[in-house]
A protein has these predicted regions:
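Glycine-rich, flexible loop segments associated with nucleotide phosphate handling
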Residues: 3-13, 96-105
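Amphipathic alpha-helices of TPR/Sel1-like and other helical repeat/solenoid scaffolds
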Residues: 4-22, 46-52
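Flexible helix-coil transition and linker loops at the boundaries of alpha-helical arrays
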Residues: 14-27, 54, 88-99
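Alpha-helical protein-protein interaction modules
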Residues: 46-50, 60, 64, 68-195
Length: 195
C-alpha cells in the first residue's frame, strides 16, 4: 500500500463499524485483539481476546491470539495452555506449510516464563528461525550453559549472516515484550554476542 497510515485508519474504521454492528462477532474481536497487540495496547488486546475466547473457545486462531496476549500480560501458564491447545487442534494453520508459527508462539511463552529448557526444545522444532525465535534460542542456550561458545553453535552460525546486520535495539522493540527488564537483557545480550 502506498500510504500505510491511511490504510490503518481505514482498517480501524471498518473494525469499529463491525463492532457497532455486532459486538459479539468473535472474528472481529479476534482481529481487534491482534491489532491492539500491534499497537501495544495490551489490556485492550486481552479484553478483545477474552471476549472472542468466551464465544469460540475451540477456534485455534482465537486460542493463538488470546494465548499470546496472556503470555505478554504475564498470565504465562494460562497463555501457554491455550497456545498448546492451538497447536494440538491446528498444527499447521491455514495458509501455512509448517507448524513454525505455532512453535514460535510457544518459544515466546517459554522464554517469558524463563523456562529455557522448554524454550530451546520448542525453538529446535522451527524449520525457519526468524529473528525473534533465533535470539530467544541463543539467549536460552546461553542461560542454560554459560560455558557454551555460542559463536560456534550451529544455530548461531546458520543465521548469523542473515541477522547480524539488524538494528537489534529496534528489532527487540518490535517483539512487543511488555517487560522492560527482559528487553534490556536482550539488548545487552545482542550487544555482547552479535555486535
Amino acid at each position: 500500500y502506498e500510504d500505510n497510515d491511511k490504510m490503518m485508519k481505514m482498517i480501524f474504521h471498518h473494525i469499529d463499524k463491525s463492532l457497532e454492528h455486532d459486538e459479539n462477532d468473535y472474528e472481529v474481536r479476534r482481529i481487534s485483539s491482534a491489532i491492539s497487540l500491534m499497537q501495544k495496547k495490551y489490556e485492550e488486546s486481552e479484553e478483545h481476546g477474552k471476549i472472542a475466547y468466551s464465544m469460540n473457545p475451540n477456534d485455534p486462531r482465537v486460542l493463538a491470539v488470546y494465548g499470546e496476549i496472556l503470555v505478554r500480560n504475564k498470565k504465562i501458564d494460562q497463555g501457554l495452555e491455550l497456545l498448546h491447545k492451538a497447536l494440538e487442534l491446528d498444527p499447521i494453520p491455514a495458509g501455512q506449510k509448517t507448524s513454525d508459527n505455532r512453535y514460535r508462539d510457544l518459544v515466546l511463552g517459554y522464554f517469558c516464563k524463563k523456562d529455557y529448557d522448554v524454550c530451546i526444545t520448542q525453538a529446535q522444532k522451527i524449520k525457519e528461525l526468524e529473528p525473534r525465535s533465533w535470539i530467544f534460542l541463543l539467549f536460552s542456550l546461553n542461560e542454560k550453559n554459560n560455558e557454551i561458545n555460542l559463536k560456534e553453535n550451529e544455530y548461531f552460525v546458520n543465521k548469523y549472516d542473515n541477522y547480524s546486520k539488524l538494528d537489534w535495539k529496534e528489532t527487540i522493540k518490535g517483539f512487543h515484550l511488555p517487560d522492560e527488564e527482559m528487553n534490556k537483557n536482550l539488548e545487552n545480550f545482542t550487544n555482547q554476542v552479535i555486535n
